[in-house]
Design a protein with these regions (language model features):
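Intrinsically disordered, low-complexity polar/acidic regions
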Residues: 4, 33-196, 200, 204
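Juxtamembrane extracytoplasmic/periplasmic/luminal helical "stalk" adjacent to the first N-terminal
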Residues: 1-38
């Protein structure tokens, strides 16, 4: 029972962190829904105000029609401009899942085209056309520093309490198991498995 409680508490922490970042993404989403466009200056200023003090979010991106059109900070991430998330081989499965489901998805971590490694939180944006029908506008995307994100969830406390842990996912296209984070010596027996929700590729603790 103690192990189950520890695992469930950890899952709750991970989901709470994701919801915190999603709230920031939703601010951008609401602005697009109201105005359909946002200037580079407005985007940069809003993104700057939303930067978290721990810098877990390393970049904010807007992807109109699925293609990265605006990034913040610009200089560090300008190489990502023009990347089509709906067609990129590594990102298209998660991006299309978010688009089709209308729900956010977390994917990665990936080697980023602008350098470094990060997970991507895709938040799909829909706007009403002149007939009142919803049309896909694109994505608000948060680039998450994976190592800092894991540190924020305090997974190391599980090991300090005598538990071993491993977070892994199955890649959508290949069903291959990929380990995202683990303790120094994860156990393979007497394990408890829990799922995280709203993850584009099934992720387990």
């Amino acid at each position: 029972l103690k192990a189950a409680y520890a695992a469930e508490t950890t899952v709750s922490k991970v989901e709470a962190q994701l919801n915190k970042y999603l709230t920031e993404s939703e601010l951008m989403e609401k602005l697009i829904e109201e105005r359909t466009e946002i200037t580079d200056t407005e985007f940069s200023e809003l993104s700057r105000l939303m930067q978290d003090e721990n810098q877990v979010i390393s970049a904010h991106e807007l992807a109109k029609d699925g293609c990265i059109s605006q990034v913040y900070p610009f200089e560090e991430n300008k190489e990502a401009i023009g990347l089509d998330m709906l067609k990129d081989p590594e990102r298209k499965a998660a991006a299309n899942l978010a688009k089709d489901s209308g729900e956010y998805t977390l994917a990665g971590p990936y080697e980023l085209v602008q350098g470094g490694v990060g997970a991507l939180l895709f938040d799909p944006i829909y706007i009403e056309d002149s007939s009142g029908e919803e049309q896909f506008w694109g994505f608000s995307i948060l680039v998450i520093d994976w190592d800092k994100f894991i540190a924020q969830t305090e997974l190391s406390k599980l090991e300090d309490a005598g538990y071993s842990y491993q977070i892994w996912k199955k890649v959508l296209d290949t069903d291959k198991k990929v380990v995202l984070a683990q303790c120094e010596k994860p156990k393979e027996k007497d394990t408890l498995e829990l799922s995280l929700i709203h993850i584009s590729e099934p992720t387990r603790l």
